[in-house]
Regions:
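Bacterial N-terminal signal peptides that target proteins for export
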Residues: 4-19
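Bacterial N-terminal signal peptides
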Residues: 18-28
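Acidic, glycine/proline-rich low-complexity segments that act as flexible tails and inter-domain linkers
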Residues: 30-76, 89, 94-97, 104, ...
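Aromatic- and histidine-enriched alpha-helix N-cap/loop-to-helix transition segments
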Residues: 75-79, 110, 202-206, 217, ...
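Short, structured motif recognition centered on aromatic/hydrophobic residues
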Residues: 78-86, 95, 115-116, 205-213, ...
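Hydrophobic/aromatic-rich structural module bridging two neighboring secondary-structure elements via a short loop
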Residues: 98-130
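Preference for long, well-ordered alpha-helical segments
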Residues: 127-128, 218, 238-257
């Protein structure tokens, strides 16, 4: 940072401002760290029982010994769905645990890296920034280096020109005069770049997107992306069980809001 000119009568305020700001940031970081430690302590069985015995029982019996062991969806897919919810809703307290669990369940570091990049577009840059910081700590603890992560620029997967042409024309017709910038970025960055990155399989990329949409109650976008997910290999049984997983991590109201859209898609697709 360049120095303020000595003749500026207010120059002394600048370093003082940054000193105060630095202290404030440090105190905030300490407070956040303490808050995260406190919340993580609440996740222990004893603390959960002390605060809410019912919550502790549901966590152990219904969630961990029940939901996560259901065979209709692999543990890996459950981790992808759950992480997508946490990132999309910026629920950072549980991220360290679930980043670690995802790695244990077979989600590769490269796939987590791509999930964060993908969700920057579908849930916002700030949410992805927060997730990247926490994932970085988990990667460091596990000795995961840059060599295991996708490069910024990669050879993209082949594009289905026919399908993309149909999508682009529909979006241009509907919204080209409303927000041409959004339409242009949607084509150039999302569907001709992001969705073609090979570090996350198209099925999994769709799974991430659908999970984020349900988690944030963005029902209008579900039909397109659920159809795309199933075109990319997600089965009807898996789509159904994704909703079951999401009920616990995104909440029952969001899932019930999404179910009519899921029902409509499933009924219109060939069995």
């Amino acid at each position: 940072m360049s120095n303020i000119a000595d003749r500026d009568p207010h120059a002394w305020r600048v370093p003082r401002f940054f000193a105060v700001a630095g202290i404030a940031i440090l105190l905030t970081a300490c407070a956040n760290s303490q808050r995260m430690r406190t919340m993580q302590e609440l996740q222990t069985t004893a603390d959960a029982r002390t605060v809410s015995p019912a919550f502790e029982r549901y966590t152990k019996q219904t969630l961990l010994d029940g939901l996560w062991k259901r065979p209709q969806l692999s543990a890996r897919d459950r981790s992808i769905v759950t992480l997508s919810v946490l990132i999309a809703r910026n629920q950072t307290v549980e991220m360290p645990f679930h980043f670690g669990l995802a790695l244990d369940n077979g989600v590769k570091p490269a796939e987590i890296s791509e999930m964060i990049a993908h969700l920057a577009f579908y849930s916002g840059w700030a949410n992805a920034t927060a997730a990247a910081e926490i994932a970085g700590h988990v990667f460091d603890q596990r000795g995961i280096g840059d060599g295991e992560l996708p490069a910024a620029d990669v050879e993209l997967l082949p594009l289905n020109e026919v399908t993309e042409k149909q999508r682009a024309e529909a979006v241009q017709e509907n919204f080209g005069q409303v927000a041409p910038g959004v339409v242009q970025y949607t084509t150039d960055v999302l569907f001709r770049d992001l969705w073609l990155r090979p570090g996350l399989a198209p099925r999994d990329r769709s799974l991430v997107t659908v999970s984020a949409l349900v988690a944030n109650g963005q029902v209008a976008q579900i039909p397109y992306h659920l159809n795309r997910a199933m075109d990319n290999g997600l089965t009807r049984a898996e789509a159904s069980e994704v909703l079951t997983q999401l009920a616990f991590y995104a909440g029952w109201p969001n899932v019930f809001s999404a179910m009519p859209a899921f029902k409509d898609v499933l009924m219109k697709r060939p069995s």
